[in-house]
């Protein structure tokens, strides 16, 4: 409470001092005004007089307001004195009332100060406006009423009316200020929510946004930014991945090689690179330089393959090649008029241009008959080897009609073929050797029907096959050796459902299931076991009596075949 009393005392002293100064100035002004008018020149008097009057009006407006403030302060100080000490009872309620009154007085004084300042600004601005441009200045309503009040009304009534109107004007001005704050904001505060507000608040929800911000999500970007993701790159960068490389790099894999390397697939390589022997390389023979030059591809016409071109050069012995083509075949006419036909580097014999048939003698002495480029000969062997073996071909594959062997070896081996595959009809062996081995084939695979062996080897074994696989049904062995060993097979795997899959003459018994060995035992020849070897052999001999008479049976079959 002491601090509150001290504050109010200071306020009261300040207002008293200000009232005393204002009264002193108001007393001295009427005396100083005539001196100013006297000292001024006649031209300056009319200009100074309105200014002086306006200042007097302002002082008159301010003076009653200050008197009211001082009166309220005096009353307030008297009430404080009447209250007494702060420790007396009821001081708490009184202090609250005093605070409320002090707040009200401070608000009134602040409002009066604001009104006075605004009136001064309005008067100064109305004087500085349009008179310099030749226009009549717009005077404030308060000034007109002030003049009329001098003529018709008293000064006190006029001042009170001015104060009321100024307070109304102050309230309207505050409303304008509030609307101004709402309608016209600074750019930073107006766009705090990242939007462009319109000029009026009525269209805040139906406003049209700016072009740049309205299309923020789907706007047309600038050329530089729009092409940032899918732009056409500059030529140097666009060609970085799929550019046409420079000639040295572009031709690194598929370049046009030099003549020596370009002819690498067709040139005659050296013996060391091809792995050939001197006997198998024709260009290593003693030939003239001109022919050797042709062999290496130095003389070409229209870049055709070497074998399609004849030689037009002249050998040292006087032979000349003629440019005559018949299916890669050309002729050579000697000086004595004899004609020699060539196919590439090979001399051909018995050439018939009509049928295009001829034969070539190979380096090993074999003769091969051709029809065009295919090995073929009608009713005669197409290949006759140097050792006497004869082979029949029909259009480049083994074949012979009338159930005759396609291969007749010099040792008596006979092999039958049908359409290039070893085979024979009517359940006859397709391969017969001089030692009595017979093999049955069907379409190039071991096969025989009617539960008969597909391989019969003398003194060794009988073998049953089905479509190239060792197989026999009805729980019978697929392999029977002459010595008595027996083996059971199912689809080329050792297998037997009941009993051992392998029975040897020495008494060894082995069980197999689908090619996997299960167990093995040895049977005694003296004691009676489940699988007596003697009983098995005797049973087999009863079923297959030709095992005992193998030699006579083999000779008989050879005579029949």
Curated annotation (Swiss-Prot):
Residues 135-156, 165-185 have a biased composition (Basic residues). Residues 103-131, 192-203, 211-247, 259-272 have a biased composition (Basic and acidic residues). Disulfide bonds: none annotated. The lineage of its organism: Viruses, Varidnaviria, Bamfordvirae, Nucleocytoviricota, Megaviricetes. This is Uncharacterized protein R871. Residues 20-42, 82-283 are annotated as: Disordered. Belongs to the mimivirus L41 family. It comes from the Viruses. Signal peptide: none annotated.
């Amino acid at each position: 409470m002491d601090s509150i009393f001290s504050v109010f005392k200071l306020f009261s002293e300040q207002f008293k001092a200000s009232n005393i100064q204002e009264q002193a100035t108001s007393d001295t002004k009427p005396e100083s005004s005539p001196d100013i008018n006297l000292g001024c020149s006649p031209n300056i008097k009319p200009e100074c007089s309105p200014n002086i009057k306006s200042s007097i009006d302002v002082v008159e407006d301010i003076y009653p307001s200050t008197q009211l403030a001082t009166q309220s302060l005096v009353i307030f100080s008297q009430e404080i004195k009447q209250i007494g000490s702060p420790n007396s009872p009821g001081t708490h309620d009184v202090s609250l009332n005093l605070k409320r009154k002090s707040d009200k007085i401070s608000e009134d004084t602040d409002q009066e100060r604001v009104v006075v300042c605004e009136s001064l600004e309005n008067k100064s601005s109305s004087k500085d406006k349009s008179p310099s441009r030749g226009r009549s200045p717009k005077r404030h309503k308060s000034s007109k009423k002030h003049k009329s009040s001098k003529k018709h009304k008293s000064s006190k009534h006029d001042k009170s009316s001015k104060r009321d109107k100024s307070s109304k004007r102050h309230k309207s001005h505050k409303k304008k200020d509030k609307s101004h704050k709402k309608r016209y904001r600074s750019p930073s505060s107006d766009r705090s929510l990242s939007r462009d507000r319109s000029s009026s608040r009525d269209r805040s929800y139906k406003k049209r946004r700016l072009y740049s911000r309205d299309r923020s999500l789907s706007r047309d970007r600038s050329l530089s930014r729009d092409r940032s993701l899918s732009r056409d790159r500059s030529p140097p960068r666009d060609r970085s991945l799929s550019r046409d490389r420079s000639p040295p790099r572009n031709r690194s894999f598929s370049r046009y090689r030099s003549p020596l390397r370009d002819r690498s697939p067709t040139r005659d390589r050296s013996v060391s690179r091809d792995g050939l022997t001197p006997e198998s390389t024709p260009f290593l023979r003693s030939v003239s330089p001109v022919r050797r030059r042709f062999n290496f591809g130095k003389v070409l016409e229209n870049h055709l393959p070497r074998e399609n071109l004849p030689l037009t050069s002249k050998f040292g012995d006087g032979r000349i090649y003629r440019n005559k083509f018949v299916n890669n075949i050309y002729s050579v006419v000697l000086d004595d008029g004899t004609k020699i036909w060539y196919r590439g580097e090979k001399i051909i014999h018995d050439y018939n241009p009509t049928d295009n048939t001829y034969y070539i003698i190979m380096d090993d002495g074999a003769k091969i008959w051709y029809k065009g480029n295919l090995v073929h000969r009608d009713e005669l062997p197409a290949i006759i080897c140097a050792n006497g073996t004869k082979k029949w071909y029909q259009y480049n594959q083994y074949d012979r009609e009338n159930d005759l062997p396609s291969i007749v070896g010099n040792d008596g081996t006979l092999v039958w073929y049908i359409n290039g595959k070893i085979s024979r009809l009517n359940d006859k062996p397709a391969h017969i050797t001089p030692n009595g081995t017979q093999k049955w084939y069907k379409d190039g695979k071991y096969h025989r029907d009617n539960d008969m062996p597909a391989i019969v080897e003398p003194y060794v074994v009988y073998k049953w096959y089905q479509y190239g696989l060792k197989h026999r049904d009805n729980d019978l062995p697929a392999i029977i050796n002459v010595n008595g060993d027996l083996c059971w097979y199912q689809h080329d795997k050792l297998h037997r459902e009941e009993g051992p899959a392998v029975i040897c003459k020495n008494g060894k018994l082995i069980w197999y299931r689908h090619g996997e060995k299960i167990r093995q035992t040895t049977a005694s020849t003296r004691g009676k076991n489940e699988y007596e070897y003697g009983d098995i052999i005797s049973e087999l001999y009863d079923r297959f009596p030709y095992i005992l008479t193998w030699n006579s049976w083999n000779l008989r079959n050879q005579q029949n075949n």
